[in-house]
Amino acid sequence: MANFDFKETFLNPIFKGNPISVLVLGICSSLAVTVQLKGALVMGLSVIIVTGLSSLICSLLRNTIPNRIRIIVQLVVVAMMVILVDQVLKAYAYSISKTLSVYIGLIITNCIVMGRIEAFALGNKPFASLIDGIGNGVGYAMILVIVAFFRELLGSGTIFGFQVIPQAVYDFGYMNNGLMILPPMALILLGCIIWVQRSIQKDLQEK
């Protein structure tokens, strides 16, 4: 069991060990839910909740789970959290839930959630596991929000559905970039984020 450092455990997955831009995990949702900021933000918050609580519960159960069925137990715990989040969204934010459709359910198979349970929660105390799960969720959500910000702004001229580019700009001939709302642009923007991060953090560059 590693010594628990709150700052390192929480901040490392946001920056140096970001699950998307560094570990390249969970990138499918960067294609699916980043056309609009609202959907990306809700998806990010959902992953934060699921990852944090799943890591906490699995850490609490780590000494009682037989090794041969640990993956099954982890999947049950994650599925339970995902169903809970999905039902809350359907009850209180139905329009967003309908927009995200099956992608909330696919959190169950997200490599980040299962990866943190296997790599951290099963070998550390509950509070440390909770912080690690939340940190990884925040790192995931941050990338989604950045990608969605540029896709919505440049592709639709809006932020959270509100028009932010003045009509006068359009009158001068400006047009929204239709390419931004196409799925491939999410990967291109993600590639730009990875390039910028590795340009700043030299230790991430491959030798």
Question: Language-model segments: which ranges?
Answer:
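Intrinsically disordered, low-complexity non-transmembrane regions of multi-pass membrane transporters
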Residues: 1-11, 201-207
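Short, membrane-exposed interhelical loops at transmembrane-helix boundaries
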Residues: 160-179
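Hydrophobic core segments of alpha-helical transmembrane domains in multi-pass membrane transport
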Residues: 25-31, 47-52, 79-86, 108-112, ...
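Cytoplasmic-side transmembrane-helix entry/capping segments in multi-pass membrane proteins
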Residues: 65-78, 99-105, 132
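Structural signature of hydrophobic alpha-helical transmembrane segments
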Residues: 37-53, 73, 97-108
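C-terminal ends of transmembrane helices
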Residues: 54-67, 114-124, 198
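Short amphipathic alpha-helical coupling elements at transmembrane boundaries
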Residues: 12, 59-63, 128-136
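Transmembrane alpha-helix boundary signature
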Residues: 84-99
